[in-house]
UniProtKB/Swiss-Prot annotation:
Propeptide residue interval(s): 418-440
Protein name: Oligodendrocyte-myelin glycoprotein
Matches recorded under Gene3D superfamilies: Ribonuclease Inhibitor
LRR repeat extents: 56-77, 79-100, 101-121, 124-145, 147-168, 169-189, 192-213, 216-239
InterPro entries on file: Leu-rich_rpt, Leu-rich_rpt_typical-subtyp, LRR-bact_E3_ubiq_ligases, LRR_dom_sf, LRRNT
A Pfam family matched in the record: LRR_1
GO cellular component term of the entry, any: plasma membrane
Amino acid sequence: MEYQILKMSLCLFILLFLTPGILCICPLQCICTERHRHVDCSGRNLSTLPSGLQENIIHLNLSYNHFTDLHNQLTQYTNLRTLDISNNRLESLPAHLPRSLWNMSAANNNIKLLDKSDTAYQWNLKYLDVSKNMLEKVVLIKNTLRSLEVLNLSSNKLWTVPTNMPSKLHIVDLSNNSLTQILPGTLINLTNLTHLYLHNNKFTFIPDQSFDQLFQLQEITLYNNRWSCDHKQNITYLLKWMMETKAHVIGTPCSTQISSLKEHNMYPTPSGFTSSLFTVSGMQTVDTINSLSVVTQPKVTKIPKQYRTKETTFGATLSKDTTFTSTDKAFVPYPEDTSTETINSHEAAAATLTIHLQDGMVTNTSLTSSTKSSPTPMTLSITSGMPNNFSEMPQQSTTLNLWREETTTNVKTPLPSVANAWKVNASFLLLLNVVVMLAV
């Protein structure tokens, strides 16, 4: 009896070593946790699957080995959720992968093609990383990968953005490729996309309406591309989209063009202005005059050379603040109103302009036998205001020195009032009529 028990124990002992998979024995080359259902066989220089893996494993790490082919070797692991086969020598994704997969990483291999059969029936897959391979083409089928949320195709050799990408995607990384185009409708179904990485490619433009359906987009990278900023017809859509989107754009292309476009949209030319010049004569005041102190306002009248007038003296002191409506054009006077002008600033980007007329003084004038003209300086100081909704714009100042020709003589008498001036003019006209009648 004791001999039979001893013999049976010996058989059971041998059975323990011959069937480790049945009795949950971890393969010698691997580290097993979570009741042997999490198996880590990374960095073991493996080229074939180790024996003894349980069929109910849920996590398998085969990274940093020398696998070249895993076709049909993983099908029986029907509970597998996470598979890491990165940093191997695979030339394609393993065929007939279990449909239970949630996460798969095949980065840093030699995969050249992601075919439709590689992802067929992977309805539960949420994360797929095929970065750092040699992919030149990606073929996806509609209604497959319908649970996929993260797709990493960065650092490959793709030249066009893959079509038929699943609609539940949140993150798509296409950086570090050779992408030159996005076919129409490629991104139209990605309404849940939050992050799109397109940097380090060869894009020159983005076709119209390509990004119009990316309603949930939070971040996009566009730097290190070959944007054709000199061809406005190619880049206009992208510039306008960047101005309107709420997403964080990293690496804004054509910064000079988008800056000028922002200024144009932010400060449009008011209706009624057809000229590109911002002129004094074309403006209307929108505020009252703060202060005006005038002894008598002079009026320049052309007088024929053969007539002389009585000696007059007049003076004026102007102190005046007037606010004008502004545009984004430079503030310049009409050419016929000035003989010389100095413009220190060529931009007036604020919402209003305040004009100060200072020291506009005309003095010491009289007529003698020889009429002479001397320039009278009038300083027009223009200071741009700051719009409330544009705090980043620097304040600017424009100064114009206006010179107006005035008929001058020596000062001897004070300036007559307006009524006296009318009397003098009436008397002069009456005398002129008498002379003409006598001559006839």
